[in-house]
């Protein structure tokens, strides 16, 4: 179950040790497809020189077809992270570890160019993790007033937003509290209904 855990709890400390995570880091959770905007997120992170932890099965896929246009973002990500020891790729992780990860992350960064729903935002908010995202697709509606919004098409805007939240403890607490409230609006039943409503709107 996604929830906020006390930072002293074993689960939280254990996930840090298990994956050798830094004390503070930005977190990305998800796939590597055109709409996720991951190459631009990495460029933004490299501008401000802070650690980025990325969780998602596709991130560790070494056997993808590099000539397939759908995989171009994976090709770009491979090149961008090659010599960057501040970027940690975890690949697929269990739900238990993911919950602990949201709890220890300083900020979730999800600068998508489009989302049908944006589940990681709600998962992060439920765990009290501050969120930086965009107003693209359904994200503005899902995030409400509980996120720091950036421009999906501008790496400088993404960098500034992440840095602002990353370095501002007061803002982190404010976004965390607002996020916990916002997430309560989306019980799983509501989430399914809302997802269906949003999908019907785009069909």
Model-derived segments and their meaning:
Residues 1-203:
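Carbohydrate transferase catalytic cores enriched for Leloir-type hexosyltransferases
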């Amino acid at each position: 179950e996604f929830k906020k855990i006390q930072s002293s709890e074993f689960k939280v400390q254990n996930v840090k040790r298990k994956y050798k995570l830094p004390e503070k880091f930005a977190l990305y959770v998800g796939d590597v497809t055109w709409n996720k905007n991951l190459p631009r997120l990495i460029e933004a992170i490299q501008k401000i020189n802070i650690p980025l932890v990325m969780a998602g099965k596709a991130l560790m896929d070494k056997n993808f077809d590099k000539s397939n246009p759908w995989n171009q973002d994976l090709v770009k990500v491979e090149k961008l992270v090659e010599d960057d020891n501040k970027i940690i790729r975890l690949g697929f992780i269990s739900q238990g570890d993911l919950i602990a990860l949201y709890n220890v992350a300083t900020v979730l960064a999800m600068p998508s160019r489009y989302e049908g729903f944006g589940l990681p935002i709600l998962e992060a908010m439920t765990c009290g993790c501050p969120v930086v995202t965009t107003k693209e697709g359904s994200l503005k509606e899902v995030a409400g007033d509980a996120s720091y919004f950036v421009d999906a098409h501008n790496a400088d805007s993404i960098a500034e937003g992440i840095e602002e939240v990353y370095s501002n403890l007061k803002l982190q607490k404010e976004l965390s509290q607002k996020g916990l409230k916002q997430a309560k609006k989306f019980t799983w039943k509501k989430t399914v209904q809302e997802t269906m409503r949003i999908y019907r709107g785009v069909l």
